[in-house]
Amino acid sequence: MGGCVGAQHDSSGSLNENSEGTGVALGRNQPLKKEKPKWKSDYPMTDGQLRSKRDEFWDTAPAFEGRKEIWDALKAAAHAFESNDHELAQAIIDGANITLPHGALTECYDELGNRYQLPVYCLAPPINMIEEKSDIETLDIPEPPPNSGYECQLRLRLSTGKDLKLVVRSTDTVFHMKRRLHAAEGVEPGSQRWFFSGRPLTDKMKFEELKIPKDYVVQVIVSQPVQNPTPVEN
């Protein structure tokens, strides 16, 4: 990524200047700016969808490049930044020897020169946020007629790392499939967020409308640990 990122800090706290012509301003380490990025989502987004998008990023980003401990530090710094605790965010960044050439978490470098880019949706909510649908509306989803449609298997990959095949019916809604997963694995429907081809699936969508190819894996982000009932020991 260019040796300038791995250069020693001088007494002013800035990286030594280097002019290798990389086209990236790596010469300076600026303090984290307090201004939050303003952005608009491609579609109106609920708080739950925003959390799902963030969970998906943090679950997958360390697998592609960079060091896990730096990703962990950036996640903690991003949370502190959004919570307006700028001193904590800056302390986390400094403690992990992370360089911010532009004073923003959207472009960061570790001391080995690895580059890390945080999407704006991990730093601030969009300007077109909408209210979450109420639980009452979810309860209004009608039950499909017994034995309607046809039975099929759906491959799921949970964010806990578990893969499984779930028996569903073609007339099931996503909400009813969540209930089936709850019965099989103990994951509350409200703690599940389903994704197909990177698109969040809403509770009212029907399986037959999703056109999921055979053996295609549907991602399920679990927002709490799976709770398996265990006997109480006296």
UniProtKB/Swiss-Prot annotation:
Tissue-wise expression: Detected in dendritic cells. Highly expressed in tumor cell lines, but not detectable in most tissues.
Keyword match Magnesium: no
UniProt-annotated location(s): Cytoplasm
Region (Disordered): 1-46
Polar residues composition-biased segments: 9-21
Keyword hit for Cytoplasm: yes
Pfam families named among the record's database cross-references: UBD (PF16455), ubiquitin (PF00240)
Residues annotated as domain Ubiquitin-like: 152-227
Skewed-composition ranges (Basic and acidic residues): 32-41
Main location: cytoplasm
Cited InterPro entries: DC-UbP/UBTD2_N, DC-UbP/UBTD2_N_sf, Ubiquitin-like_dom, Ubiquitin-like_domsf, UBTD1/2
A single GO cellular-component term on record: cytoplasm
Source domain of life: Eukaryota
UniProt keyword list: Cytoplasm
Protein name as it appears in the record: Ubiquitin domain-containing protein 2
